[in-house]
Amino acid sequence: GADGALLFEEDVLCRIFGAYSRFETLKGIALVSRAGYGSTSMDYAFFDNRDYTSFKSLTLRASAMDSIYTRIRDILIQGLLEDGGSILPTQAYVQVVLYINGEYWGVYNLREKVNKYFLAQRYGLADPEKIDILVGNGVSLTAEDGAGNSDSGYLDYKALVEYAGSHDLSDASNYAYVCSLMDVENFAEYCAMEIYVGNTDTGNIKFWRSEQLDNKWRWIPYDFDWAFNREDGSTSITYTTGYRRDFFTKYLHPDGHGASKGFSTVLVRALLQNSSFRALFLEKCALMLQIFDTDTMIARIDELSANIKEEMAYDTAKWGVIRFVTWETRVEGLRESAKNAPEYFLYYAQQYFGLSDAEMTEIFGRRSSLTGVS
């Protein structure tokens, strides 16, 4: 606790967690309860905003690719989504300082781990084993349970995409069939969110379904370490101009999305041919402007960065990957995004959908103050 008192103690399995972040200096660590270690769950109220206090697994994340930039990018976005009333299932977090065998290891975020147990808790599902999860690693899509592309969930999802791509979804019956297989409100909100935050790692995805609910596919907000100002496929970071990019065209590109455009956009583009879904999607875009309101976002950036500012001085001194002043500059880059992203989002929304000024006012309350972007 704050006074140094021990709050929780348990023997758990610890293992390196993540994909490309395994190559970072500060690696993610998964904490997993195992009966062989004494307990099948970690029973403690780790997160103030969760009404459940039993966890099969947790993660300690140093923000992966954001570990040398701000250390708060992912928790910033997920926290604002949750507080803003998003229907997307976000991961709870607590900012912590990690010691390993008594050695100072630096600033981490304790997080819920996105898996079948996480979903069972969030949605009140009795049997975690009756949950299908599909995952993307930035390159390909597969089933999380190890069954790979022979998994029934993978095959069913592939069939859904093929149907959407080969049928006119402006037709009410065709659209209704697709709606019977996926939660279109969840999907519309997920896509609008990815575009607003300018995520350049959109291929790192997780989505799921369960017969215990309605067996519809739903998407999970996951891994925003490359959001806001990150340039895909490049080691260079533009901290004051990254928000200027047209993420509507990027995310909805016919060739695909993700760092290598390896993920199909057939489903979302087919759905956008339906006027009802198009209206829903634009409604969700308007919601993102509310959730990521400039003042709200800057206040949260200030809060999260202040929480770790003192520790980041020690952290940067220990690892030497970046200087403390560089961290401060990069946090300021997030503030710049908060100030400028709304206008560019509005501008590109109007350009992509060909909306009139009157339609912009009806949907968003206003049009962008920008008159042109070069």
Predicted regions and their residues:
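Conserved ATP-binding subdomain of kinase catalytic cores across diverse folds
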Residues: 1-147
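Middle-to-C-terminal accessory/interaction subdomains
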Residues: 5-25, 66-67, 96-99, 104-108, ...
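Generic low-polarity alpha-helical segments
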Residues: 31, 81, 341, 373-374
